[in-house]
A protein has these predicted regions:
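Conserved hydrophobic/aromatic packing and binding residues within compact polymer-binding modules
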Residues: 23, 37-38, 48-51, 77
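Hydrophobic side chains within well-formed alpha-helices
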Residues: 19, 23, 73-74
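DNA major-groove recognition helix of helix-turn-helix
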Residues: 52, 70, 81
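DNA major-groove recognition helix of helix-turn-helix/homeodomain DNA-binding modules
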Residues: 42, 61-76
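Short basic helix-loop element that most often maps to the first helix and adjoining turn
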Residues: 21-40, 65, 90
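Recognition helix of helix-turn-helix/homeodomain-like DNA-binding domains
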Residues: 41-57
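Short, charged recognition helix plus adjacent turn
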Residues: 1-15, 78-92
Length: 92
């Protein structure tokens, strides 16, 4: 039942996860090749290329590594926000 509700919510959502164009932009901004990024992810250039084209869903562990590599939030990569970095405030 819960899975059905989640699917329905995602189908009705205006947010579309369009991470693949951002992956390429971030990589190019970092002056890196697909092969270099793939090596950091311990995967092949072919697999990474599929992430950038949207032909393959990126695993969470790769998403986290890329966010750290590029200094952006995972939400930015996923297209859920246009703010690259999450502001962290210290509380006392």
């Amino acid at each position: 039942m819960v899975l059905k509700q989640i699917r329905q919510k995602l189908q009705n959502s205006e947010v579309i996860f369009m991470y693949f164009p951002r992956l390429r932009d971030l990589r190019e901004d970092a002056d890196m090749t697909q092969a270099q990024v793939a090596k950091l992810l311990f995967t092949s250039q072919t697999v990474y290329s599929r992430y950038e084209r949207g032909a393959l869903t990126i695993p969470v562990e790769h998403l986290l590594i890329l966010a750290d590599l590029y200094g952006v939030s995972t939400d930015y990569i996923l297209g859920r926000t246009n703010t690259k970095k999450v502001k962290i405030t210290a509380s006392r």
